[in-house]
């Protein structure tokens, strides 16, 4: 299956999270069960391979690292999982303009 990366460069972080939920009807149920991991990266294919993500729910390019980091913060506030991190994110760099979400096995 080819990875589809949506262009969300003209959306705010809140709009991107809303769009993610709108595109995936079963996402709310998965979030309630802590089964959706969300992250930010500069190389989306490498990161998804590293996570061994099987069911990719959302991939998008944002306008900037700042927007991508804000998407992660908003998603976490809405119940998405970011792993064993307590500070609200796994860190980003200036190339981290992609956001992704996948179903946790």
Where are these regions (language model features)?
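GIY-YIG nuclease catalytic motif and its immediate N-terminal context
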Residues: 1-105
